[in-house]
Amino acid sequence: MNLNKLKKKAAWAALDYIDPGTIIGVGTGTTIFYFIEALGTIKNLIYGAVSSSNSSTVLLKKHGIEVFDLKNFSSLAIYVDSADEINNHMQMIKGGGGALTREKIIASMSKKFVCIIDKSKKVDVLGTFPLPIEIIPMALSYIFREMIKIGGTPKYRKNVITDNGNIIIDVYNLCIKDPISMEKKINSLPGVVTVGLFASRSADIVLIGTQKGIRTINKKENR
């Protein structure tokens, strides 16, 4: 079974966590596109969605789901998103699709974070997938130097401007054994908008698409 089929399995499984009449926080990426497709089948049961990217907004509207502005809400019941990597503590690297800042804002405002992935995204230590960082353009050379200091190899993501009007660098060759500490360190650097480490706000539930079906990891059971 190819990875796209496993992504689709996980995406459809997330519907079990959607309560009628709620507004759903929706992430970005290929796995989330499957989730939006699934969400469209129950669009009459939900109130609508808050989107983390322009691309997800377009797809949500295409499936007849009303999209609301996050600034009108103090919290959301649930946020569904994927991850580029996730460790045993349900901490993640996200931002391969470039929407990391908006994703982190919605995740932080949501009572429940459901992460949907295929089995290839599960790792013991974060860092094999390059770590995305959204930065203000004038900070590029400074942030490059700071990433080299911590042992990383930064690369500018060419031809990409985020929905916020900023740029992204991807940092290779990191072995992130303390994700919370690294998240705080990088976020504290002047010019950083946000780093694609979701460690302080980790997932509450992980749904992993496997050939044998859905593997569910619950934060309470994982402690």
UniProtKB/Swiss-Prot annotation:
One Pfam entry for this protein is Rib_5-P_isom_A
Task: Kindly list the GO CC terms recorded for this protein.
Answer: cytosol
Named in its record, the pathway it takes part in is: Carbohydrate degradation; pentose phosphate pathway; D-ribose 5-phosphate from D-ribulose 5-phosphate (non-oxidative stage): step 1/1
Tell me one GO biological process term: pentose-phosphate shunt, non-oxidative branch
**Active site as annotated:** 103 (proton acceptor)
Q: What is its EC number?
A: 5.3.1.6
CDD domains recorded:
RPI_A (cd01398)
- Where along this sequence does the record place binding of substrate? 28-31, 81-84, 94-97, 121
Enumerate the UniProt keywords alphabetically.
Answer: Isomerase
HAMAP family tied to this protein: Rib_5P_isom_A
**What task does this protein carry out?**
Catalyzes the reversible conversion of ribose-5-phosphate to ribulose 5-phosphate.
Q: Outline the subunit composition.
A: Homodimer.
Q: What is this protein called?
A: Ribose-5-phosphate isomerase A
